[in-house]
Amino acid sequence: MAQKQTPSGPTQRQQRVAELIRHALAEVLQRGDIQDPVLGSHVVTVPEVRMSPDLKLATAYVMPLGGQDEAPVIAALERHKKILRQEVARRVNLKFAPDLRFRRDETFDEAARIDQLLRSEKVQRDLESAPREDDEGEPDSSSRD
């Protein structure tokens, strides 16, 4: 039975499988099951995994703690992709173990950019000049009889 891919995003099954794989990857990386000097010297977080509609490809978004040495960490994960796939397959009960892809997680950068925009002088000026909800002439609920 084919799963429907909705234009609004991934299916519930894709999300559930992605979360299982995220937990499995995080556990493998936390325990240090992969013997690699780069991975051994960094704490790697896995904030998100996205699954393809057929559940055969998992894209893991990773970030070393502190955000430094991203390229070597991703290269090390790519080198050990086969072992990581085997470990994920051992921990997650699926018909097929998905191929793994590793990408840099950019959500922290995006959050910092949005925070910087919100703190900008222009936005602060707009917020100060905007009318407040309680100033719009609506009666206060405490003054009702």
UniProtKB/Swiss-Prot annotation:
Please report the name of this protein according to its UniProt entry.
Answer: Ribosome-binding factor A
Question: Which compartments does it reside in?
Answer: Cytoplasm
List keywords of the entry alphabetically: Cytoplasm, Ribosome biogenesis
Give the protein's function. Answer: One of several proteins that assist in the late maturation steps of the functional core of the 30S ribosomal subunit. Associates with free 30S ribosomal subunits (but not with 30S subunits that are part of 70S ribosomes or polysomes). Required for efficient processing of 16S rRNA. May interact with the 5'-terminal helix region of 16S rRNA.
Its subunit composition reads: Monomer. Binds 30S ribosomal subunits, but not 50S ribosomal subunits or 70S ribosomes.
The entry sums up its family as follows: Belongs to the RbfA family.
GO BP annotations listed: maturation of SSU-rRNA
Q: Is-annotated flag, keyword Cytoplasm? A: yes
Output the Gene Ontology terms for molecular function: ribosomal small subunit binding
Q: Where is this region: Disordered?
A: 122-145
Q: Which residues form the signal peptide?
A: none
Recorded GO cellular component terms are:
cytosol
Query: Where do Basic and acidic residues bias regions lie?
Result: 122-132
